[in-house]
From Swiss-Prot:
Region (Disordered): 50-153
Xref: PANTHER family: MONODICTYPHENONE CLUSTER TRANSCRIPTION FACTOR-RELATED, OLEATE-ACTIVATED TRANSCRIPTION FACTOR 1-RELATED
Pfam families found in the cross-reference section: Zn_clus
InterPro entries according to UniProt: OAF3, Zn2-C6_fun-type_DNA-bd_sf, Zn2Cys6_DnaBD
Statement: the UniProt record of this protein carries the keyword Lipid biosynthesis: no
Gene Ontology, cellular component aspect: nucleus
Molecular-function annotations in GO: DNA binding; DNA-binding transcription factor activity, RNA polymerase II-specific; zinc ion binding
Keyword DNA-binding set for record: yes
Protein name: Transcriptional regulator fogI
Low complexity bias spans: 80-102, 123-135
Length: 415
């Protein structure tokens, strides 16, 4: 037009016609002319920055473009200074157009969902800033979508980055929650905190000690020996091939008697509101003791042994002594075999007398239970204890008949 070469647009905004020539007198591309379509944006906005917006009608655009045919050079020279009304309209048009095509709108939507940190947003705009600094062909003026014009903090509120303060606040919140649970249970702080009287713990050493004192008062080990002895008297010992020697058997019977006496003499029976179930375990252990005596007597003396057959039982005991069991001795005194057999039989009788005394203690315990706890204790339980004691006495009397007349020398065995 005035001897200068103008750059060509990439395409027409109305029909995507390539290489639309910038012409002040002919602002229509060839395709729009063939299709008889209004081509308002045929002019390049690099040299025709005051072109009418798309919202204006075609008549207004022609009148606006026709009113300035002779002042094209002046408008081109003063294209930097755009009137306020036209600049406002162009900014509105550009904002409406970029609302559907600009890639920056999904940016704040993604930020609301994935919460990117602020430095990544600045880095993204720093990469896009050279494109905005150049004259744009899709909007009026540079820097419309620059970070300076976009008020990102107004519509983007990212979550705080997990730093040290955030972590401390998180654990402090958890501590408050644990403190609240401790207030409900009343013992969490005492369990998690050492039992000291330091300030700030909320408890004192005496309070914590009182809390754990109650289970210690109720603990009782008087009945543990009964259960231990019942477990030690295993069934395989009844086999003759695996029978224990005399000293081991008598030691085991002695421990059982001591454990039963300790259980019946226990004073931790409570306030009388429950039955002493331990007496059933004691009765079971006494029954096992009687069975052991019966096995020993049947093995060494023989069932139904009478006085004329005593010599035969002594010979059997001599063979047993020489094979399996240790010999009895008293210092430098050497015992004969028959003397040793007599001493062994008296040891049997001695421990059996201890068993009889244990049965007498059981009888006293049951009578005391009947007299002192008759009102609070279950009568059925008391009756069961009485029947168990009666059965044990009858069983012990049957075992006592297996002994030979050991009291023919002395009327009683000294205790």
């Amino acid at each position: 037009m005035d001897g200068k070469t103008y750059k060509l647009r990439a395409s027409c905004n109305a029909c995507n016609e390539s290489k639309v020539r910038c012409s002040q007198t002919k602002p229509t591309c060839a395709r729009c002319e063939r299709n008889k379509t209004t081509c308002v944006y045929g002019l390049s906005r690099r040299t025709h920055k005051d072109a009418p917006p798309i919202s204006l009608s075609h008549s207004h655009s022609h009148s606006h473009s026709g009113s300035q045919p002779h002042s094209h050079s002046g408008s081109r020279r003063s294209s930097v200074h755009i009137p306020n009304a036209t600049a406002t309209a162009n900014a509105t048009t550009t904002a409406n157009y970029t609302s559907t095509t600009t890639p920056f709108m999904p940016l704040h939507e993604n930020s609301m969902t994935s919460y990117p940190p602020q430095p990544s947003v600045d880095q993204f705009f720093a990469q896009q800033q050279p494109h905005h600094q150049q004259p744009s062909t899709a909007g009026p003026g540079p820097g419309i979508l620059s970070p300076a014009n976009l008020d990102l903090p107004s519509f983007m509120t990212p979550l705080p980055t997990p730093n040290e303060d955030h972590t401390n606040s998180l654990f402090s919140s958890f501590g408050n929650f644990a403190a609240g649970v401790g207030g409900v249970n009343g013992s969490v702080n005492n369990i998690l905190t050492p039992l000291t009287g330091s300030p700030g713990t909320g408890t004192s050493a005496s309070t914590s000690t009182d809390m754990f004192q109650q289970p210690q008062v109720q603990e009782c080990t008087c009945h543990a020996g009964v259960m231990e002895q019942m477990a030690s008297m295993s069934q395989p010992s009844r086999n003759e091939e695996r029978r224990l020697s005399l000293d081991v058997q008598l030691s085991q019977l002695k421990r059982c008697i001591i454990a039963s006496e300790a259980s019946m003499g226990c004073g931790h029976h409570g306030n009388g509101d429950s039955e002493p179930i331990n007496i059933i375990s004691v009765a079971m252990l006494i029954g096992r003791i009687i069975d052991e005596f019966e096995l020993m007597l049947n093995e060494r003396i023989g069932r139904g042994t009478t006085m004329p057959e005593r010599e035969r039982s002594l010979s059997l005991d001599e063979a047993t002594i020489s094979i399996r069991e240790p010999r009895l001795c008293w210092g430098v005194l050497e015992l004969e075999d028959d003397d040793e057999v007599e001493l062994r039989q008296r040891l049997y009788l001695l421990y059996f007398r201890k068993l009889e005394r244990l049965l007498s203690q059981l009888n006293v315990f049951v009578r005391t239970l009947h007299d002192s706890r008759g009102g609070s204790c279950n009568p059925t339980f008391i009756m069961a204890c009485e029947y168990i004691h009666l059965w044990l006495e009858k069983k012990a009397e049957g075992v006592k008949r297996l002994f030979p007349a050991a009291d023919e020398y002395t009327g009683r065995i000294p205790s």
